[in-house]
Amino acid sequence: MKLRYISDLHLELIKSFQINEFIEQISPNQDEICILSGDIGNPYSKNYDIFMKYINESFKKTFIIAGNHEYYNNNKTIEETNEFLVNYFKQYSNISFLNNTFEYYEEYCFVGSTLWSNIKNPNYKINDMYAIKDFDYIKYNSNNQMCINFLENTVKNNNNLIVITHHVPSNDLIDSKYKVSNMILYNQWFYCDMDNFIEKNKDKIKCWFYGHTHTSSIKSINNIPFLCNPIGYQNENIHNNFTKTFIL
């Protein structure tokens, strides 16, 4: 199985006249499965429609989850946008939206969750608190627990798991440049400590895709490949590409 993995395209920042040129960089392959690990774009936008139509027609199957930015500046709650996305993706025969849900494809169980972080110091805030309607750190942590409960319940009765989350599932996956004293509180918004879960279920998890951080990475934890390929903001010039694949 050949998996194309991408995250953090941030289509909401692409000009409408640039969108077709932007997505052509994907160079799709009909033999591949596409993994979209969140922060793809504003789901209420034309750019999002153009992109999803292209993806649906270009890969034999796509699995997508929401990141935090899917919920930004829509005057909608997280629950309202989740409901919208469930209905939105019904029009696409080859795309599955996973929101604390799983789906079997061939012999693998694709498991998807935004995996919100657990916030221990609410005094240090990021844009999520301002850009998402009716959202605060209490709801943030409540969503975090729902995601963890889902993953723990799913793994009990399923094997051959391909896990897709937006938030980073281990502090070990945070780039060293962010592990400095003035970034420690900031990092709590980027990762969810799933180390015990990973260790306990290392024989069931085949690979794990994530996003949120704009640092590309392939790293093994407990012999599980953890993969991240963010495109990032255009002004970051991080030079990641659309064509990274993982063969399982």
Language model: regions and residue ranges:
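Short amphipathic alpha-helices and their capping/turn segments at secondary-structure boundaries
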Residues: 21-26, 51-56, 94-107, 111, ...
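Beta-strand-turn-beta hairpins that frame and shape the catalytic cleft
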Residues: 1-4, 102-112, 159-160, 220-225
